[in-house]
Amino acid sequence: MKQQAKSRKPQQPEYIFQVETLSHEGRGIAHYGSHPDHPADKHGKKVFIRYALPGETVKAQITHEAKRLEEAEMVELLAEPSANRVEAVCPHYGICGGCSMQHIHPDEQIHLKQNVLQSHLQHFAGIQPEQWLEPIRSLQSDYRRRARIGVRYLPKQDRLILGFREHHSNRLTSIHTCSVLDKKLSDNLPELRNLLQSLKGKAHIGHVELAKGDHEISLLVRHIEKLNNADVNQLRQFALHKGWQLYLQPKDQSLRRIDEEQGAMRLHYALNAFDVNFAFSPLDFTQVNATVNEQMVQLACELLQLQQGERVLDLFCGLGNFSLPLARCVGAKGQVVGVEASEEMVQRATDNAKRNNLVQASFFSQDLTKDFSHHSWANQGFDALLIDPPRAGAYEIMQYVPNFGAKRIVYVSCNPATLARDAGVLVQHGYQLKKAAVMDMFTHTEHVESIALFEKIQEIND
């Protein structure tokens, strides 16, 4: 069986390799020396091969050479494919840089991500959870409810490109569909491209952002020069026809909704298991995968084992995605304190608590990378702690954790390396890693989302 690659760069050497294992980001790993045509001076050198899977024999073209390793791209599958190989569902896969694992069976994707988390915990902290929980799985398509899509006008060709960046490149590749984007968004991409192509100011548009709430869709157009009235009216008519909210964002980053009389500048989503509803702006951070998000919040609340009347601290709380469900769990006699750097997001969380009649939830603005020990909210004592930091993790916060007095900590992570680093500090503070799970928030990509439960097991003089 032979399988041709999607592209081939001229004047780059090609070799046959036996693929041995997968890297953390899903590339096949092979070594020089497994085939007679390999250069003798390269024997033993490691090669990372895009699209190749363990057990396969492939022809690969070298794309990058370094002293200790090389990178390559599979151009031909020379024997039987791996049992874990599947047909990619997207016609743009291999050119568009959005997905990197559509050729890998979903079960193997999750297995790989769990191995990544396990490896990082061992390497950085020397620990493993007492129990691995079942992974939280995603839909395999139509799961993304928001996307930023690049726009570039090519004047010599009078052609507008609407699409995503190519793999490891700043070049945009034109797309007419996206298999992981919500179908109500993906199906409108060709019509949206034609609309943007027709605008006089198309050369001044940098990107568009599509976002979907449970019942609304928004279109945000980012432009570096002011659009004329005719262009704005064309965008308005398109949005009215679709029933979408339309927003313009000029170079100064301000956000303006067109036709504000049509309703408030908000989208909405609900977490039905907790009877809470959230309002958010198109620029607010929200989890892109609604199905996984709801399962994640439910699992976090289950792991914390909250009782009525308990006190919970939610760090990096955003618009209250965890805070409001936590407030439901502790009841009217409990208290949830949410802390977030962005004052705008704190106001959004406060408004969301009010709209859900959750008076037991309060929110504070604080840069959590700076000393916050003098603030009153940090010295109240808590039964439980939830941390959902950005990719950089929560290392600066770890020194304050003993002062919170939390018996249980749930750490939600989008970076297994920083989770493992911070886990090592929590262990030093007398916590034990009890449970962990991976969450397939970004299926078909190498991004690893995870959740971990730590419990206090001993008192340590910090």
UniProtKB/Swiss-Prot annotation:
Keywords: 4Fe-4S, Iron, Iron-sulfur, Metal-binding, Methyltransferase, rRNA processing, S-adenosyl-L-methionine, Transferase
Binding-site positions, S-adenosyl-L-methionine: Q287, F316, N321, E340, D367, D388
Keyword rRNA processing recorded: yes
GO biological processes: rRNA base methylation
Record bears the keyword Ion transport: no
Enzyme Commission (EC) number: 2.1.1.190
Catalytic activity, reaction form: uridine(1939) in 23S rRNA + S-adenosyl-L-methionine = 5-methyluridine(1939) in 23S rRNA + S-adenosyl-L-homocysteine + H(+)
InterPro entries xref list: 23S_rRNA_MeTrfase_RlmD, MeTrfase_TrmA_AS, NA-bd_OB-fold, SAM-dependent_MTases_sf, TRAM_dom, U5_MeTrfase_fam
Domain TRAM, first and last residues per copy: 6-76
Family: Belongs to the class I-like SAM-binding methyltransferase superfamily. RNA M5U methyltransferase family. RlmD subfamily.
The protein's name in its UniProt record: 23S rRNA (uracil(1939)-C(5))-methyltransferase RlmD
Organism: Acinetobacter baumannii (strain AB0057)
